[in-house]
Amino acid sequence: MANTIARSGGAGGGSFDFIKILLRGTGQVMFQNSAWTGLLFMIGIFWGAYAEGQGLVGWGALLGVTVSTVTGYLLGFPAKDGEQGLWGFNGVLVGCAFPTFMGNTVWMWLALALCSALTTWVRAGFNNVMAPWKVNSFTFPFVFCTWMFLLAARAMHGLPTTHMADPALPAAFSSLESIRFGDLAVYWLKGIGQVFLINSWVTGICFLAGLFLCSRWAALWAAIGSALALLTVVAL
């Protein structure tokens, strides 16, 4: 596997190229094949996680992207996909989700690693099934696998659903008169941060900066998308 990573990473080879592959995987959550974008994303994840008192989310993200990427090499999938970070983006989301919704136990970390590895295999399967229609699975492997694990966790003592909310109807939004522009700006940035389940406006800034570094259009449309979603909620 190490030789494969060295060949796909470029002339330098070694662990530095593998780190770049992991960062590209993080950036691919928002379709950016850039290690620098992934670095800013990872900084945003760690900042927001520790700021919210959930630092384990950052380490979960790091473990998830590593396990899912290594799994791709172990399964012998095309190295080009690995070089572009396409094995890592589902894993990093799994790594953010598990510590967010479940308590800190050994079984949670084992489940996180297993689910992250599973997303790489599930991604290949879904892509093969949908190939005739030229449809990519994108982050559906993360959604599907995480749903299965979280549903099962409610029946497992080793996977405490400490932070998982009970089903409830949505509450009414505050009246427009009580909303300040500063609050809207914070909500807007937090909406971008929530792509990785991080509730931090600073994280949102890091994500926008990472997008802008790779694609100004991607940053613009991410900003517009979050703004439109926020305005829709306020209007309703």
What kind of feature is each model-predicted range?
Residues 1-77, 187-198, 203-214:
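N-terminal signal-anchor module of multipass membrane proteins
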Residues 3-8, 137-197:
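Long hydrophobic alpha-helical segments that form multi-pass transmembrane helix bundles
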Residues 36, 47, 59, 87, ...:
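A residue-identity detector for tryptophan
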Residues 40-48, 65-71, 113-121, 142-152, ...:
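Hydrophobic core segments of alpha-helical transmembrane domains in multi-pass membrane transport
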Residues 42-46, 50-119:
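Early transmembrane hairpin of solute transport permeases
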Residues 58, 78-93, 134-136, 218-228, ...:
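Short, non-helical or kinked segments that cap or interrupt transmembrane helices
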Residues 86, 91-168:
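Membrane-interface helix-loop-helix junctions at boundaries between adjacent transmembrane segments
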Residues 176-180, 194-209, 225-234:
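Helix-loop-helix junctions within the multi-pass membrane cores of secondary transporters/permeases
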